[in-house]
Amino acid sequence: MKGFDPEFQDLDQYIRVITARIWEGRRIDDIRRYYSDPCTVETPSSVSTTVEEVVSGTRATLATFPDRRLLAEDIIVSGDEDGGFLSSHRLISPMTHLGDGEFGAPSGRKVHVRTIADCVCKDNRVVHEWLVRDEAAIARAIGIEPRALAQTWLDQSGGWDKPVAGPAPSGYRSHISSAAPARAYAGAIEDFAHGGNPAALAYDEAVHHIGPGGATCYGRDETAGFWRALFGTLRVKSFTVEHLALNSGGGRADRLALRWRAQTLHQGESPDAGRYGPATGRPVEIMGINHVELLHGKVLREWVLVDDVALWMQVLTARA
């Protein structure tokens, strides 16, 4: 771990420790210690570039959800100490909506929301981050439909205006695994995006899929239905695999992280269309991060982080 404090033995430990200190321990000022400045943080609906924006965003979230926890479900690692490591960190956050903020007046309701953060880490700091949080799960938990929340945010912001994120730091090269299981999975998702049959992927008969809004699918048919509905409504013009990593061993199933981006048109020509309302023809960008567990080449569990609220914001902008 060249350039990191001696206490950190590997990337997994580094991510767990700084998460515990900053967010679990409420040592918010430590963000300035463990994040570079500038540091680009991209979400499906926003791009920030300074460490102070990370600090202020964290404080705002805690004001709205003061009992928020960040419980690590998994960390899938790649990269090296020269070009930079990348941690793909899946978290589940139990929390209660107790304060005013971007989700409106406090409802007092309990929320469980999943997030995946892909962080480039170099010289003891997070230097670039891609983050997808399941905003639709928060909305539904507090009694708001994702479409309604999207409209509220559009009204407050004056419309959809996400800037283009800057490139990752010099010297960092996104990891694209050459392992056969990783390539097969990424290739299958890209094939789905272009109209292929999701049933062709080697899903286990009892696959467990968790998608946007915290929705759960069981089995091959329901899981394939999710992909058909998504890409049937948003017709893909281009699909890019941005990061692909496979971790094996440790007595566990193989674990895979895939970050992808699709440029689409909201056309809704499929019989499964309707997920985002009547077609508008509007260009819509999907920024997704998937985590997968595989055993003997079959997908046992699949987590798909896509921000439905950000997608609705793009669709509703067209209607406005």
Regions found by a protein language model. Give the residues of each.
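C-terminal and inter-domain tail/linker signature
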Residues: M1-A320
